[in-house]
Amino acid sequence: MGIRAIVVDTAGTTTDLNFIQDVLFPYSVKALPDFLEQNQHNVLVENCICDTRDIALEPDADLARVTEILQQWVSEDRKATPLKTLQGLIWKQGYAHGEFKGHIFPDFIEAVKRFSEQNLRIYSFSSGSVDAQKLLFSHSDGGDLTEMFNGHFDTRTGNKLDKQAYCNILNTISLSPKQVLFVSDVIEELKAADAAGMMTCQMVRDSKQRTGEFRTISSFDELLIE
């Protein structure tokens, strides 16, 4: 049957986690107050504000309180969809203004080109919004990589720790589980993908990283698909 598609995690796998934590997250925290104030009547932003109130169980929270909630979620690394949507919108401004470029590991930049030449389908699955993923790969320090991808998945597909999310991906891309390889640095995500029947591989870029029973690689250079 063989592998026909590769689904990659982002932070820690294709992207340095430090770029997310030290550049993108602080930027979104700093920009949130002004962004919400200036865009609160935009339909998408307004929906995110309402969803934040609902999730926080604070239906009467004013804009300042909503901002506090969102900033707290960033510090807790919460995977709440309204936060991830707003972060994507804020980062779009940052990329557009040239305030940073998306960090992508060089070995993935080379590998994604190789996979594309092999006619393998490439997808990304992240807790960051689809828009944020597209921004990361289109404004990367390796150039625009978006044409190499066949699609992106985020929290709307499901929680990355839940088997059902990977079943949903399989249904969307219409491939059988053994035709799809999921690559991530997080053991719990690999367990969920494995439970859905997917092939799995753990990216171990740090020698101190926790590993399990999964096949491991330290670079995409080691991932050879026949």
Curated annotation (Swiss-Prot):
It comes from the Bacteria. GO terms for molecular function: 2,3-diketo-5-methylthiopentyl-1-phosphate enolase activity; 2-hydroxy-3-keto-5-methylthiopentenyl-1-phosphate phosphatase activity; acireductone synthase activity; magnesium ion binding. Keywords: Amino-acid biosynthesis, Hydrolase, Magnesium, Metal-binding, Methionine biosynthesis. Its EC number is 3.1.3.77. It catalyses: 5-methylsulfanyl-2,3-dioxopentyl phosphate + H2O = 1,2-dihydroxy-5-(methylsulfanyl)pent-1-en-3-one + phosphate. InterPro entries: Enolase-ppase_E1, HAD-like_sf, HAD-SF_hydro_IA, HAD_sf. GO terms for biological process: L-methionine salvage from methylthioadenosine. Its cofactor is Mg(2+). Pathway: Amino-acid biosynthesis; L-methionine biosynthesis via salvage pathway; L-methionine from S-methyl-5-thio-alpha-D-ribose 1-phosphate: step 3/6; Amino-acid biosynthesis; L-methionine biosynthesis via salvage pathway; L-methionine from S-methyl-5-thio-alpha-D-ribose 1-phosphate: step 4/6. Binds 1 Mg(2+) ion per subunit. It is an enzyme of class 3 (hydrolase). SUPFAM superfamilies: HAD-like (SSF56784). The keyword Cytoplasm does not apply. Bifunctional enzyme that catalyzes the enolization of 2,3-diketo-5-methylthiopentyl-1-phosphate (DK-MTP-1-P) into the intermediate 2-hydroxy-3-keto-5-methylthiopentenyl-1-phosphate (HK-MTPenyl-1-P), which is then dephosphorylated to form the acireductone 1,2-dihydroxy-3-keto-5-methylthiopentene (DHK-MTPene). Monomer. Belongs to the HAD-like hydrolase superfamily. MasA/MtnC family. This is Enolase-phosphatase E1. The gene is mtnC.
